């Protein structure tokens, strides 16, 4: 164990693979250790610089990885981020989020990791304070789906580990991240990626409900240095920080921007699903502590991602064969 290391879980997904690229380019004095079960990520997303372990954090022990490598910082990104699907896959959701996080917490405590950076979710806010226009870190979380509940439970567990075992942590609440290396073949999550798949396969771009839901989309490249800062800056210690784009768009607006970029005109509305109407977090704390800069407009970010999507190899689209429950499931998922 000669060289200091960072560990990234979910390393083959969007955020993990892109952060591993950033660390490889900008922090050459660190080795990059990556863990992924390859359920929603792809091995060809990562470079050969990553020391990769194919492990399932919900099932497998990982102490041997910590014993083999001098891991200073852990970025825990591994999760299955499908809020709308989670009411129909509660057990899977809980294992992949809460059980895997407990595994990581135990290892961070046992092996004296300097800091754990955990990506939670804006889903912990639920509907938020309907009198306000944005979710603030000081708001009391009130999630409305099993995914948000599990992410909030993980936050609380990490805080307890900090209080009882002196584990240093920073909790990031990212929102609506998109960009190159995103899984566009999963029909249950990542609306911008779903639309790109639909365009590439000459299917209508589907909007659930009236499309007036508000979201602040985040180009992944704008977040990477901030995530590193969450691990290393003293002022980020034991902070909860929203991280992402500052400009709200309706789903209709986002669909129209992408349709214009792709030269596409098939957009259809389907039955609404159980989700919050507006989800736009505050951002000042990320600027003050992490140095966040919202530099990429939605149009520019989608243009870049679309050029990437047109030129990557196609993959089979993922569909759940067996939901845990089917009562009340949406017609477009049957």
Task: List each language-model region with its residue ranges.
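Hydrophobic alpha-helix immediately C-terminal to the catalytic Tyr-X-X-X-Lys motif of short-chain
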Residues: 153, 157, 161, 191, ...
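N-terminal Rossmann-like NAD(P)+-binding domain of SDR-like oxidoreductases, especially those catalyzing
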Residues: 1-174, 333
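Structural element of the ATP-grasp superfamily
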Residues: 104, 158, 195, 286-287
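A conserved pocket-lining segment of Rossmann-fold NAD(P)-dependent short-chain dehydrogenase/reductase
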Residues: 86, 139-140, 171-183, 194-218, ...
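Active-site loop immediately N-terminal to the catalytic Tyr-X3-Lys motif
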Residues: 90, 184-185
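Conserved sequence/active-site signature of Rossmann-fold short-chain dehydrogenase/reductase
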Residues: 124-125, 177-179, 223
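C-terminal substrate-binding subdomain of Rossmann-fold SDR/epimerase-dehydratase oxidoreductases
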Residues: 200-334
């Amino acid at each position: 164990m000669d060289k200091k290391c960072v560990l990234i879980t979910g390393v083959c997904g969007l955020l993990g693979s892109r952060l591993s690229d950033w660390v490889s380019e900008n922090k050459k004095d660190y080795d990059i250790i990556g863990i992924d079960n390859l359920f929603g990520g792809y091995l060809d997303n990562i470079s050969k610089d990553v020391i990769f372990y194919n492990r399932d954090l919900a099932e497998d022990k990982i102490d041997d990885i910590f014993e083999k490598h001098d891991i200073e910082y852990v970025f825990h990104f591994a999760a299955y981020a499908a809020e709308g699907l989670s009411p129909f896959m509660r057990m899977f959701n809980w294992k992949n989020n809460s059980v895997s996080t407990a595994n990581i917490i135990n290892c961070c405590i046992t092996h004296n990791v300097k800091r754990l950076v955990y990506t939670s979710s804006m889903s912990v806010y639920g509907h938020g304070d309907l009198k306000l226009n944005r979710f603030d870190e000081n708001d009391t979380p009130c999630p409305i789906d099993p995914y948000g509940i599990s992410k909030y439970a993980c936050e609380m567990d990490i805080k307890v580990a900090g209080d009882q075992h002196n584990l240093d942590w920073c909790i990031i609440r990212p929102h609506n991240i998109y960009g190159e290396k995103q899984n566009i073949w999963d029909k249950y999550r990542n609306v911008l990626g779903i639309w790109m798949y639909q365009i590439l396969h000459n299917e209508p771009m589907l909007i659930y409900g009236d499309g007036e839901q508000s979201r602040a989309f985040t180009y992944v490249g704008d977040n990477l240095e901030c995530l590193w800062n969450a691990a290393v800056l003293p002022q980020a210690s034991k902070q909860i920080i929203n991280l992402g784009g500052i400009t709200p768009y309706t789903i209709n607006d986002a669909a129209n921007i992408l349709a214009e970029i792709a030269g596409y005109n098939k957009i259809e509305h389907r039955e609404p699903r159980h989700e919050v109407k507006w989800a736009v977090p505050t951002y000042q704390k990320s600027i003050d502590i992490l140095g966040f800069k919202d530099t990429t407009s939605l149009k520019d970010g989608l243009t870049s991602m679309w050029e990437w999507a047109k030129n990557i190899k196609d993959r089979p689209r993922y569909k759940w064969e067996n939901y845990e429950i089917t009562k009340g499931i949406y017609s477009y998922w049957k």
